[in-house]
Every structure is written in structure tokens, then in C-alpha cells.
Amino acid sequence: MYFYSLVDDVSVNTKDYLKYIKSKHCLVCGSTPVDADHQDTIGMGGDRKKQSIKDFTCIPLCRKHHTERHSIGSFQFEHKHSLNLWKEAFYLLRGYFAE
């Protein structure tokens, strides 16, 4: 992805951003607590403790909706809940840097 090529050489601390995401409410039902759900997935066996630029693609979803998204897939999830997950991820990232 083009975004990653822009920031490959930049050392970023994503822990604060993940805390920011986890302070939000679920995009679907508004509940808390939430998981930081990666749009650009880490994958099975990926090192979730290692900081990654992929952390900036996270959205807040409660455990129920996080599990649902992975069960039915992003396309069906977006259609069912009338969401654009990448757009939401962008708005959250923009809001984080605006604070």
C-alpha cells in the first residue's frame, strides 16, 4: 500500500494510538469496552506485541462485532451495518492527530 511506503522509514509509537482507539465506543452498537480491530489484518500467528504501522488502520469494535466482522467478512459486515470501515479508520486517525 502507498501509505506504508510513505512511513516505512518513520519510527512511530503506536501504543498511544491503540489506547486512543480503545477509549472509543463500538462503531456498531456504541458499547464499551472495545477491541482495536485492524483493517489491515495482522494475520494468524502475527506478533501483536510488536508495534506496526498497521495499528493506524484500527477501528473500535466490541468483542461481539469484532468476532462478527471476522466471521462474515468485511464486505458483508459493512453492508449489514451501513459502514465504510476504511473511512471510519481514516476519520479516527485524523481525529487522533487533530487532538
Predicted feature locations:
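Cys/His-coordinated zinc-binding microdomains
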Residues: G30, R63-H66
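Divalent metal-coordination and catalytic microenvironments
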Residues: I21, H38, C62
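Residues immediately within or flanking Cys/His clusters that coordinate Zn2+
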Residues: S23, F56-I59
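A boundary/linker detector
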Residues: M1-L18, K22-D35, K87-E99
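A broad, low-specificity signal marking well-ordered, structured residues that form hydrophobic/aromatic
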Residues: V34, I59-P60
